[in-house]
Design a protein with these regions (language model features):
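Short amphipathic helical patch at the helix-1/turn junction of helix-turn-helix
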Residues: 1, 11-13, 27
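Short basic helix-loop element that most often maps to the first helix and adjoining turn
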Residues: 5-20
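Residues in the recognition helix of alpha-helical DNA-binding motifs
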Residues: 10, 24, 35
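Short polybasic/polar patches that bind polyanions
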Residues: 12, 23, 55
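Short glycine/serine/threonine/alanine-rich loop segments
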Residues: 16, 27, 59
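Recognition helix of helix-turn-helix/homeodomain-like DNA-binding domains
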Residues: 27-42
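DNA major-groove recognition helix of helix-turn-helix/homeodomain DNA-binding modules
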Residues: 44-63
């Protein structure tokens, strides 16, 4: 499973728009949109922000995904 796919699943589990998720992660809407659509890859800081978001909201992904 790609980062973008995980991002989209986590966002939808929290019933957030891309704009709201971007704000919570501290990035722009266009950046989050590019990640979800596989047009860009996040840097370490962004990956950490996503990890922290998942921990905060108790969202887990199987390592095999």
């Amino acid at each position: 499973m790609t980062f973008g796919e995980k991002l989209k699943i986590a966002r939808k589990k929290q019933f957030l728009s891309q704009e709201a998720m971007a704000k919570e992660m501290g990035v722009s809407f266009s950046t989050l949109n590019r990640w979800e659509n596989g047009k860009a890859e996040p840097n370490y800081t962004a990956q950490k922000a996503f990890h922290d978001f998942c921990v905060k909201h108790k969202i887990k992904f199987d390592d095999k995904e």
